[in-house]
Amino acid sequence: WYSTTFEDFQAITNRLVPTITALATAGDYILIGHSLGGVLLRAAINALPPGIQRPRHLFLLASPIQPSCLAQRLSRNALYRLVTGDCGQLLGSSERMAGVGQVSTPTTAIAGTRGLRGKLDAFRGDLNDGIVSLGEVSADWFDAPIQVHTIHTLLPASTRVSEIILKRLAEDRR
């Protein structure tokens, strides 16, 4: 686990690399990251030492690839800065998000689409899960995100998400 309040992005990533390295020595593995967790996994995969086996597949659940518009809007809010720390600032930074980079691991993005609409829509009509938009979790280095009609927080607990992951892993085995 990690605490965005007390740890910066690089410190969390540095702690994650040996964990993934140990996992890789046990054989074939996959990684699943939700939201910031997916950003941390991408950074950690890119920081793995040479010769360490990469994951067979990376699943990103509502994990921003592009800077988060909510993080950008909240970046000057004292409470947001206190709670999210350096990681919250990273999520709103074009330069820092680009610096995380893409991974060469086969990647599947899964995005929620049950966010607010109308007057309370912070995403200007873009499909979203209430925290990130479909555009923010999209990239040209993997297929379009698979859409699931749920909110950001519930995405990891979604039966539909589990089915998608299991189906993709079965397809990978063929």
Question: Would you name each region that the model predicts?
Answer:
Residues 102-174:
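C-terminal catalytic-base region of ester-bond hydrolases, centering on the histidine
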